[in-house]
Amino acid sequence: MSDSTGSVRKGFSKSEKEVGEALEGIVKNHHKGRLIIAAFSSWISRVQQLIDICHKYDKTIFLSGRSMVENVQIAKDLGYLKVKPGIMKKMTPKATQGIPPHKQVIITTGSQGEEFSALSRMSEGRHPSIEIVKGDTVVFSSSIVPGNEKSVVGIINKLIKLGAKVITKDDREVHTGGHAFQEEQKIMIQLIKPKYFMPVFGDLYFRTVHKDTALTVGMKEENCLLIDN
């Protein structure tokens, strides 16, 4: 069984090193307003990248969103996150006092347009601690999960109306997918040499493309299984 989420993407996915370089460039050259970065709360390595970058450029990180706060705390407790003292704080109404806006980096949930996420509340003026104003920059350090396009675009439009600048992976290399592209799928099939191959995790279109990719590296048509539950 093989994940089909990235099956329509040709070539190879970008490396985390490239993403880190793009994020560093954004943080380094950000001199006006707050920098708000939306990311998956489970992507702890991305949080570590941002911690290291912000420490390098003397920025303070604020966490927004329950799952972000909880996952970061768990990762710290287990030793998966290395955090310099004083660089990271939980977002509260008083937490940012005395810190210039351009020195604030807010890592938030809501990269998929979730209705009750922290970023969604910011875009609608309902966040208890953050009011989006002209000069703020919002970075979507994520890919849009298929099916979430409308929700994400809706939030982007609301943020722009409030005066924020929005950066996505279409503008800069601020995210690499957690799912294999076609060339990586071929490599896995060639390494494992399965007798049977079942594309999973994707609608019929994505799974069919994945099956077609498998056929190009020698899988037999009768051994490729397209199954609906």
Where are the regions a protein language model picked out?
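Acidic/His-rich, metal-assisted hydrolase cores and their charged scaffolds
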Residues: 1-229
